[in-house]
């Protein structure tokens, strides 16, 4: 039995969240009555209201009146008044991943998982399937610049979704094609151990049906090891590794982007097929690898090389993924969501390759627990930044941890050999700090999953106001 059409109002608690808003938008476009609430106003709330979805600011018991279904994410606490009211009224409560799974049952699906690169890779797969006239439905974890939203309803039989592993619920998603970009120690607050993280990703791949396939990056040692332990499923490997089925070769910087080839080698016949002259308008090896994963899916689904080449060249990117927010006196300001050491290192390497000037990193650490558990990694991931400006930790609802703060992080970076580390006393001081550091040709890269994105967009104007 599939999701029936006659379901009444579907109420989303926390509808403004990036994952929840995408599901709500697709359900609305399918013709379901959708409503919801969020703790605050925001761009996603405004967008959903513009589509005719009723959104209330604040969580109150009366908000669920008339709802037939309540959708919650794992971020919603058990004492949330709307959740309590729904349970008191015997209204069915559905987890976000379960509702996404119901939508996925209506289509053939590509699900993209991995500690890093999910959102960009999801957007690339969507762009390639779009170009191949698949007209896919898409639910992403970030705003796709080409759509101006993180979700769209397509008329085709395929669906492309970002599979969020943070709470383990990605194992509920029924997918025909699974991509695994990488697996690093992350979300240990949920999984407790890295072994448990790896087990979850292995199960994600093993859940693929016999007629589907997985696309896995064997440049990553953990993923390569996982490939060797997975039996009875078809796996297409990718990476710069010479053993990859889809091999990224001849990668070279190309202005603000990359130029490369992807060579496919058939394991049965050893025949090679080359997709050459690929130009991606995004810098960095990590983005070229993300593109290789998407190209591998497109190739398997029969999309012609010329279509792949054209779609990659036209890829418009994702909001908060190496997004240029403006310039000042020849200085380029970049906003990026990177908040894990692996992501930060990749972004700064891309910045280094994109400019002959200096790279100034402005980092707002995200969560005390993440900074604590990965402190050594954070202290060694800024090597491609000439200067690191460190803001206070963005708590994301967490209580402070003694010895885990901006000043200790500054000391840690210096102790690990970084030559220039500057503590940011307050956000209002950022423009003055950058004005004293940056010269024409330099890149200023704002990094973090908190409200640093607002600083990045305000910074060009604030710098101009200084003269």
Curated annotation (Swiss-Prot):
The keyword Cytoplasm applies. InterPro entries: Mur-like_cat_sf (IPR036565), Mur_ligase_C (IPR004101), Mur_ligase_C_dom_sf (IPR036615), Mur_ligase_cen (IPR013221), Mur_ligase_N (IPR000713), MurCDEF_pg_biosynth (IPR050061), UDP-N-AcMur_Ala_ligase_MurC (IPR005758). Its main location: cytoplasm. GO terms for biological process: cell division; cell wall organization; peptidoglycan biosynthetic process; regulation of cell shape. It is an enzyme of class 6 (ligase). Pathway: Cell wall biogenesis; peptidoglycan biosynthesis. ATP binds at residues 114-120. Its EC number is 6.3.2.8. It catalyses: UDP-N-acetyl-alpha-D-muramate + L-alanine + ATP = UDP-N-acetyl-alpha-D-muramoyl-L-alanine + ADP + phosphate + H(+). It is found in: Cytoplasm. Coiled coil: none annotated. It holds the Pfam family Mur_ligase_M. Belongs to the MurCDEF family. Cell wall formation. This is UDP-N-acetylmuramate--L-alanine ligase. It comes from Nitrobacter hamburgensis (strain DSM 10229 / NCIMB 13809 / X14). The lineage of its organism: Bacteria, Pseudomonadati, Pseudomonadota, Alphaproteobacteria, Hyphomicrobiales.
């Amino acid at each position: 039995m599939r999701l029936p059409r006659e379901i009444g109002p579907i109420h989303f608690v926390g509808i403004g969240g990036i994952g929840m808003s995408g599901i709500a938008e697709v359900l609305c476009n399918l013709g379901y009555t959708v409503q919801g609430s969020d703790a605050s106003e925001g761009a996603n709330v405004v967008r959903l209201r513009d589509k005719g979805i009723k959104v209330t600011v604040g969580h109150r018991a009366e908000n669920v009146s008339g709802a037939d279904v309540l959708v919650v994410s794992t971020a919603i606490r058990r004492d949330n008044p709307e959740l309590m009211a729904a349970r008191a009224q015997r209204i069915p409560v559905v987890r976000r991943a379960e509702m996404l799974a119901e939508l996925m049952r209506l289509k053939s699906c590509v699900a993209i998982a991995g500690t890093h690169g999910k959102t960009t890779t999801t957007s690339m797969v969507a762009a390639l399937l779009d170009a191949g006239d698949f007209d896919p439905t898409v639910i992403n974890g970030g705003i796709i610049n080409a759509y101006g939203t993180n979700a769209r309803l397509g008329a085709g039989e395929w669906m492309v979704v970002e599979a969020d592993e943070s709470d383990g619920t990605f194992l509920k998603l029924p997918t025909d094609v699974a991509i695994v970009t990488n697996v690093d120690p992350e979300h240990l607050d949920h999984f407790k151990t890295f072994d448990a993280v790896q087990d979850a990703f292995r199960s994600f791949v093993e859940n693929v049906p016999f007629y589907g396939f997985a696309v896995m990056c064997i440049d990553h040692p953990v993923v390569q090891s996982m490939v060797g332990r997975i039996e009875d499923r078809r796996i297409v490997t990718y990476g710069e590794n010479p053993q990859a089925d889809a091999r990224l070769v001849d990668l070279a910087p190309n202005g603000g982007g990359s130029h490369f080839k992807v060579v496919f080698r058939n394991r049965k016949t050893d025949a090679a097929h080359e997709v050459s002259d690929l130009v991606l308008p995004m810098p960095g090896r990590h983005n070229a690898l993300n593109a290789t994963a998407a190209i591998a899916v497109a190739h398997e689904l029969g999309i012609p090389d010329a279509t792949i080449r054209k779609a990659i060249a036209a890829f418009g990117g994702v909001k908060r993924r190496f997004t240029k927010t403006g310039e000042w006196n020849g200085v380029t300001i970049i906003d990026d969501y990177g908040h894990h050491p692996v992501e930060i290192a990749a972004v700064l390497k891309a910045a280094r390759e994109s400019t002959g000037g200096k790279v100034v990193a402005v980092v707002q650490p995200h969560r005390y627990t993440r900074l604590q558990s990965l402190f050594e990694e954070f202290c060694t991931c800024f090597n491609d930044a000439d200067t690191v400006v460190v803001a206070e930790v963005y708590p994301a609802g967490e209580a402070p941890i003694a010895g885990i703060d901006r000043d200790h992080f500054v000391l840690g970076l210096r102790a690990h050999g970084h030559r220039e580390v500057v503590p940011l006393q307050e956000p209002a001081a950022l423009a003055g700090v950058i004005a004293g550091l940056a010269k024409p040709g330099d890149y200023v890269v704002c990094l973090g999953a908190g409200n640093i994105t607002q600083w990045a967009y305000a910074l060009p104007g604030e710098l101009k106001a200084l003269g």
